[in-house]
Structure formats: C-alpha cells, structure tokens
Amino acid sequence: MNIKSLIRTIPDYPKPGIQFRDITTLLKDASGLRQVVDALVERYAGAKVDKVVGIESRGFIVGAAVAYELGVGFVPVRKKGKLPGDVLGHDYALEYGTDRVEIHSDAISPDEHVLLLDDLIATGGTAEAAAILIEKLGGHVLECAFIIGLPDLGGERKLRVLGYKTFSLCQFEDSE
C-alpha cells in the first residue's frame, strides 16, 4: 500500500495558494496507520532512542504510537501556554511575525537520544525550534522524522544544513 495515496490534498487551505496535505484520511485507514507506525518503528528499532518528541498536534498521534512500540517515553512539544508547570520555550520566525513552542523543563535528561517526529515538514521552523529545545535540555537529536516532506519548501534541506539528520516517509512536490 502506498501511504501517499491515502493523504488527501485540499487546495487553497487555509489560504489561497496553499496545498494542504491532510493526514486524517491516512489516520482513519487502519492499514495505512499501521504501515506508517511500523515503518518508523522498523527504522529506529535498532537505534539508541531514549525518548520520542512529537510536535503539536499531529506529531502526537504517530509519535506516541512509535514511542510505545519502541518501549520509550513520549514528550510533547506544544504551542505557547499549553503546557502546565515549568517550561522552556523557543521563538521561531513565521512569514509574518513569530511563534513559540515549549517543552517541560524536565522532559529530557542530559545525553538522552531523542527522535523528533511530526506529521509534515514544510519550511522547517517548528522542527528547528523543537530540536533547539531538546538540545537546550541536554538531549541529542537522533533524527527529525516526518510522514510527509515538502522538498519545494526547503525544510529538510534547512535542517540538514544545521546538522540534523532528516527522514520522510513520502514527499509531495508543489505540482502534486
């Protein structure tokens, strides 16, 4: 089964000119969801992974399942103000302005090896911010993994230039 065929494209959402890649059609398909989780688990089963970090919100869905299968803990990275208690935050640039993601300050221990997971990478700003938070807590980013890569937007390339390894299960070009 090709997981790419289970991902719906919604044109002009959330604004004109955007091709929104909707994974809810993939997630509702039991075989498709299993294929995604199994592929990621297979990739990292032999690696030293201490934690899986998932980025809000769709990164939580697959990230928690992968963490469970790997037998490691799951850590959420959330938008500003969504985590209770002591948090560490990092601001990152948007097309117009900035946004912020946060992680609990005790979520990662020094020298832990962390798999960073999200549903999609576009420009890479959110993934970069999450990786920086992991490193500020003393963790090491093993790899930044995504269900979908959008190579035309340069996010994976940006992360690789910054020294992070990246992996996407499938990729969509702008024309698709």
UniProtKB/Swiss-Prot annotation:
Coiled coil: none annotated. It is found in: Cytoplasm. GO terms for biological process: adenine salvage; AMP salvage; purine ribonucleoside salvage. GO terms for molecular function: adenine phosphoribosyltransferase activity. PROSITE patterns: PUR_PYR_PR_TRANSFER. Pathway: Purine metabolism; AMP biosynthesis via salvage pathway; AMP from adenine: step 1/1. Its EC number is 2.4.2.7. Keywords: Cytoplasm, Glycosyltransferase, Purine salvage, Transferase. Pfam families: Pribosyltran. It catalyses: AMP + diphosphate = 5-phospho-alpha-D-ribose 1-diphosphate + adenine. GO terms for cellular component: cytoplasm. Its main location: cytoplasm. PANTHER family: ADENINE PHOSPHORIBOSYLTRANSFERASE, PHOSPHORIBOSYLTRANSFERASE DOMAIN-CONTAINING PROTEIN. NCBIfam families: apt (TIGR01090), PRK02304.1-3 (NF002634), PRK02304.1-5 (NF002636). Belongs to the purine/pyrimidine phosphoribosyltransferase family. Homodimer. Catalyzes a salvage reaction resulting in the formation of AMP, that is energically less costly than de novo synthesis. This is Adenine phosphoribosyltransferase. It comes from Methylobacillus flagellatus (strain ATCC 51484 / DSM 6875 / VKM B-1610 / KT). The lineage of its organism: Bacteria, Pseudomonadati, Pseudomonadota, Betaproteobacteria, Nitrosomonadales. The gene is apt.
